[in-house]
Amino acid sequence: MKEISGIKVKVESGSKYTTDHGFHAVKDGIRNKKENAVHVRKPDWLKVQKQDSKEYLKVKSITKKHKLSTVCEEARCPNINECWSHGTATIMLMGSVCTRACKFCSVDTGNPKGWLDKDEPMNAAESVKLMGLEYVVLTSVDRDDLEDGGAGHYAATITAIKNLDENIKVEALTPDFAGINENIDKIINTKVDVIAQNIETVERLTHPVRDPRAGYWQTLNFLKYVKQKSPNVLTKTSIMVGLGETDEEIYKTMDDARSVGVDIITLGQYMQPTKHHLSVERFVTPQQFEEYRKVGLEKGFLEVASGPMVRSSYRADRVFKRNNLDL
């Protein structure tokens, strides 16, 4: 269901619809493709229990009131009940329609034609205050339709939160801003604590998995530039497993990330969001995820969050504190 002009309308996955702002988008980001209609039965360790607690409903109410999107909802994150029940959410900036169409992602795609909610930076800051967050994760859709990729809007949101309370820690999981350094600088020049850019998969699978405008080394060079310009800012990336990669390729990706100074890495199981998206090639066991974590720490990462249900922003506050995670 999509809420358009305040009315809930059923939009089929893979279908085109018109947004409240007058531009077209594709529901769940991928048009209907029968060849991907393969579903693999999930193992027991991936089953999640729904828990609509009072805190969950509070977070939902706050984000709706302030007209904010969350990646928790738009990307169908399996941890939404756990995180929202603990009063945390990952705010997704610049709307819920992405200009890119990665084959794993269920965020809607389209061309917003320059639309932005000018009130969003302050609305986001006020929501953070109402939720009582000490650590907030910001992410966004890609906005290739904007001259700076939305970097200025993103930076304004970070600044609004820090102006509200400079003690709030902010993690920015950003787009690659087309690899343009002056756009990246807009994020670096805020008081952001963590800058993340997800590599998503191993180098061999980058083209079939990610949008053609994204790139394996474009992501790594982004993170390298951040670390060179601001050594005190923690850098972070994330890998999905289960797309057809080998363990050796995962370890090579870890090496590549460490070579550009990445501090934190997360690894989680890819789960096919709709029948039109890439199929799951394998389900990795919790034991193997623990092995990934062990290897990652040996390679020098300050922290490795690795588990079937881990996503890039999952328990981000705990990862920031560099605790050993019981995942």
Curated annotation (Swiss-Prot):
Entry-linked PROSITE patterns: RADICAL_SAM (PS51918)
Cofactor note: Binds 2 [4Fe-4S] clusters per subunit. One cluster is coordinated with 3 cysteines and an exchangeable S-adenosyl-L-methionine.
SMART domains, alphabetized: Elp3
Keyword ATP-binding among record annotations: no
Major subcellular site: cytoplasm
Catalysed reactions, as listed in the record: [[Fe-S] cluster scaffold protein carrying a second [4Fe-4S](2+) cluster] + N(6)-octanoyl-L-lysyl-[protein] + 2 oxidized [2Fe-2S]-[ferredoxin] + 2 S-adenosyl-L-methionine + 4 H(+) = [[Fe-S] cluster scaffold protein] + N(6)-[(R)-dihydrolipoyl]-L-lysyl-[protein] + 4 Fe(3+) + 2 hydrogen sulfide + 2 5'-deoxyadenosine + 2 L-methionine + 2 reduced [2Fe-2S]-[ferredoxin]
Entries under SUPFAM superfamilies matching the protein: Radical SAM enzymes (SSF102114)
Cofactors, names only: [4Fe-4S] cluster
InterPro entries, per database record: Aldolase_TIM (IPR013785), Elp3/MiaA/NifB-like_rSAM (IPR006638), LIAS_N (IPR031691), Lipoyl_synth (IPR003698), rSAM (IPR007197)
Pfam family, any one: Radical_SAM
Radical SAM core domain mapped to chain residues: 83-302
Sorted UniProt keywords: 4Fe-4S, Cytoplasm, Iron, Iron-sulfur, Metal-binding, S-adenosyl-L-methionine, Transferase
Binding residues annotated for [4Fe-4S] cluster 1, in chain numbering: 72, 77, 83, 313
Subcellular location: Cytoplasm
Domain of life: Bacteria
Alphabetical list of Gene3D superfamilies matching this protein: Aldolase class I
Iron is among the record's keywords: yes
Family under the similarity heading: Belongs to the radical SAM superfamily. Lipoyl synthase family.
Name of this chain's protein: Lipoyl synthase
Organism from which the protein derives: Francisella tularensis subsp. tularensis (strain SCHU S4 / Schu 4)
Gene giving rise to this polypeptide: lipA
